[in-house]
């Protein structure tokens, strides 16, 4: 399930679409001047297109995870991308509980688990073994023999008697073979399992984990907030146009340019409503009950395999 965007409290970026991307727009800059916290998730919506978006930047949140473990570069990159993705997906559902991404691999990375609560507090860990080349692909990391398992779990904060967490299985391949990266995996899942056209851009390094999500709004034609009707073909054209703008994003740009500047460059001539950002944070409140629940979520087979692999 997805949630509607809250009432706008920010500024507007107005204009017409062109294929170029110049630097700044004063109205949006005025809104962001009050947003000094780096660890934030920003929601936005296009007035002239049936599209909503989110942009997340994890800095201190991400570094708090890295301070606790020394991961090889490919593991760090995948873990950071999973954290950014978990924040984006959590902000996109109406749910009081935790969204958990669980990746159990058959390669050098045996397990990655990321948990994001409804208030965007997060924690994450990974288990790996052996030497891992810096250029290792997703398949080489977790799906060498095609036996990897990836799941999205929604674990309610308050459970009714007998209620079990919802879990969706996420394929790592499509009809053409293994999917190349985490963004492609989640896009494929959202399209085929949730029937939602979704695009994701993810990146991480030693200091930042960032991501952007664009999602086509369900329903028939109509300009957001105006009641004006459009043909489905117009909606599809607008969706494709916004995605083309997103495709101009480069990994280095996502990791080096602040959220304000990046959104201005991408959508400088679109009419975009910007909403009050939400703050992310690292939080690990381990307790006997929480550890027990985590082990139950992993399943007996996975827990026993960890013991079997101990020297």
Name the predicted role of every residue range.
Residues 1-34:
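N-terminal mitochondrial targeting presequence
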Residues 31-276:
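Interaction interfaces in information-processing and related assembly proteins
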Residues 249-311:
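Cys/His-clustered metal-coordination modules, chiefly Zn-binding fingers
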